[in-house]
Amino acid sequence: MGRKEITTKEDLMKVIELFENTGITYWLDGGWGVDILAGKQTRIHRDIDINFDAQHTEKLLNVLLNLGYKIDTDWKPVRIELYSDELGYLDIHPFVLNEDGTSKQADLEGGWYEFEKDYFGSVFFEGKTIPCISLKGQKVFHSGYELRDKAVSYTHLTLPTN
């Protein structure tokens, strides 16, 4: 049997609930992060991207492995991609959180990406307030490399003004 290659809105909401239950600080990122900023699903998503407090990496991995996820790609401390037959792909990114609200993420060359505090926020989606990367953060996170066709709209995203 093939792998689940699409994560649905229902999968997303289950993953959000899972993270809320861990008590670990997190933010939704990636394609689903853009979609909740837009207030609706705009395309099909292969995975769910979550940035989280790096000091809880082992705790989070234990929770996910106990729920049936298996590690698919291990690029610690940069990212870890996991797979669940039920919920599909989950790409987690450990962030070191600073007291002033800024953060940093390890890069593949042994350095760091530095992030401003206004890259992090929350949005109301499907009856819940969900921590997510802000529009400004999404634009910065998706700069510096060539976007896939389905992601080009990220840089043109504007939010409703209501």
Can you name each region flagged by the protein language model?
Residues 119-137, 142:
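Phosphate-handling catalytic interfaces
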Residues 62-66:
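Short amphipathic alpha-helices in soluble, non-transmembrane regions
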Residues 155-161:
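Conserved small/polar residues in nucleotide/adenosyl-binding loops
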